[in-house]
Amino acid sequence: MTTPKAIIFSKNQIETLKKYSEQNSPNEACAILFGNNTDEQVIIKEIFLAKNIDESPVNFTISNEELIAAYGSAEKMKLDVSGIFHSHPVSVPHPSSTDKKYMEINPIPWVIFSNINDEFKAYIYNSGIIQIPVKVL
Ligand SMILES: [Zn+2]
């Protein structure tokens, strides 16, 4: 995937992700974002809320079962897996060293929400961590 110029959410999607992050606090919340990877700008179409099996305030893991289910429903909806979302309940929305490691393995947009400053930021790995503007339409 090339580096998109922006990642675009609807107001409702932003509210859904914020609410889910608050519900999961003090642990990290996670979700899989569906869209269309052919777009120069990634427009998020659907959100697949996932369980953080680590139940940790500093890490997240999505089970293989849920990953398989997510890929299955993306395919049914003729959408691509366009991003990975997780929250940072106790820190700013910058990738942790663990995040950076997994971003390199999985070079699609990573969206991080911080519960402490109510901010969404997106990044992608492309020979280094690059920030992608988050837009709300
Ligand atoms: Zn993180």
List PLM regions with ranges.
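Conserved beta-strand-loop surface patch within small alpha/beta domains used
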Residues: 1-81, 90-137
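Short, well-ordered beta-to-alpha junction loops that form the rim of enzyme active sites
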Residues: 87
